Amino acid sequence: TLETGIAIVAFIKIAVSLAWLITVAAQPTMGVAWHRFLAFFNVWFQRNADGRPALGALQPIAVKGEAIDFENIDELDDDASLGVGAIGDFTWKALLDVNTCTECGRCQSQCPAWNTEKPLSPKLLTLALREQSHAAAPWLQAAADQRSDLHEDVLGIAERQLIADGDGDPWAQTSGGVMSPDVLWSCTTCGACVQQCPVDIAHIDHIVDMRRYQVLMASDFPNELNGLFKNIENKGNPWGMNASDRNAWIEEVDFPVRVFGMDGEDEIPADVEYLFWVGCAGAFEDRAKQTTKAVAELLHMAGVEFMVLGEGETCNGDPARRAGNEFLFQMQAMQNVEVLNEIKATKIVVT
């Protein structure tokens, strides 16, 4: 009868559902199954409350959930970790992120590093962190005062560094690390992975946090970045160019460009409506200079009075921040804020 048929179908559906739940309970590492439970919570607690993907300015470096100011760095505990060096350094939201991955591969398909045959895959990176979080689960779940009593194997897994000391298999789960340095440093921080993720995983935040540890705690980063950091700190730009060359593009336009300080100004004159922040690339890089000149020409043709800082500009620290040197970024940012406050700049145009 119809009633019997409905009962049989209902029984089969219930049996299949129970079998699925038993399977998931027996194999908690089945991430494809767990995302069905976790996706809602991950999206609910997403980084941006307005519903936008987890893109935009990088989050400040935090210790124990509190954003830190490097002016007060001496007040930190001796055991404080800047950035993320082991799985236990991640926040609860970061651990929720990696365990919510659906393994759909959208992030990987859009990643410029992966598509140019670099070892980085946002998907594999997320899965590697997920596997490490599962392996260290007893340590993560234990109370802080009980962790020292755990078995030494568990302690060894929990203390395993995320980034290996040398090159090798990019994703080898060995005592030397969870992933190779090449994986970490292949990221361009473009944000394509975050934009494509259907469950709002913040890949870039996690990558930059691991870079911060490598730079600020382990002092283990590519040699090329050493030159970058020194140039920004000493010369005020990533390429080590002289500050006097910031005005070179002005000689290539056929209209006057006012430069702050050339007439002895202490602050932006009242007749100047906008300060044009040219930036390092806009002042030194040939292709970017074309954009700088085009914007200046548009302002001139529109009759807008504007002024540039010229030699008074310095790097905003963004390259250092993307590379994990949060200390250098904050130093550059505070220097620029001080300059802009001194000259009383209220309207700024950037490209």
Name each model feature, range by range.
Residues 3-14, 23-26, 90, 96-99, ...:
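Generic recognition of flexible, low-complexity loop/linker segments
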Residues 1-76, 83-84, 123, 127, ...:
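Membrane-embedded alpha-helical bundles of multi-pass integral membrane proteins
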Residues 56-115:
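Acidic, Ser/Thr-rich low-complexity segments on the non-lumenal side of membrane proteins
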Residues 30, 39-46, 50, 113, ...:
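Short, well-ordered loop/turn and helix-capping segments at boundaries between secondary-structure elements
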Residues 89-98, 120-124, 133-351:
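Iron-sulfur-cluster electron-transfer modules
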